[in-house]
Amino acid sequence: MPDLILASSSPYRRELLTRLRLPFESASPDIDESHRAGESAEELVRRLSASKAEALAGRYPQHLVIGSDQVAVLDGNILGKPHTPERAIQQLRDASGKSVTFLTGLALLNSASRRIQVACVPFTVHFRHLDESRIRRYVEAERPLDCAGSFKAEGLGVSLFRSTEGEDATSLVGLPLIRLVDMLLEEGVEIP
């Protein structure tokens, strides 16, 4: 089996990948993550996940390279990572009582054969009605500044949800393991 490389510096994605009990290394790809004019959210995450995997293919020529990218979509608009408490508070105000769809792009590149599999896995979160004090307490407690949509589903963020829907809850954290297992099986990787 070729060695696995996770093209990400995300601790959340690393933690998810450890669940498969496969040895892997993690490396940070250096790519332009800008949104292109006219590009849909799905096209964006598919392109970026593939670009992340391809960016590491030269350094890892006999490996399976996993790339992933995620955006949140609210009322047709892409929500990025907030980076500041003020933007996180605003994103959660905007999401209050609404549904946000998270699109997670996933790519698995066999760098030896150059075969690439790419997918987009949607997952929808239906938010509770959130008052200002609850939003502020949450942002202060969890500091979700590096998370699209301004919450951490693996932590207190789940308290903000009324319900969720989708095929793979791990996609919400940023690495859809069910789809990844499908891709790894296609490459002949045995799990478990």
From Swiss-Prot:
A molecular function GO annotation: nucleoside triphosphate diphosphatase activity
Class of this enzyme: hydrolase
A single GO BP: nucleotide metabolic process
InterPro entries attached to this UniProt entry: ITPase-like_fam, Maf-like
GO-annotated cellular components: cytoplasm
Family to which this protein belongs: Belongs to the Maf family. YceF subfamily.
Protein name: 7-methyl-GTP pyrophosphatase
Native organism taxonomy: Bacteria, Pseudomonadati, Pseudomonadota, Gammaproteobacteria, Pseudomonadales
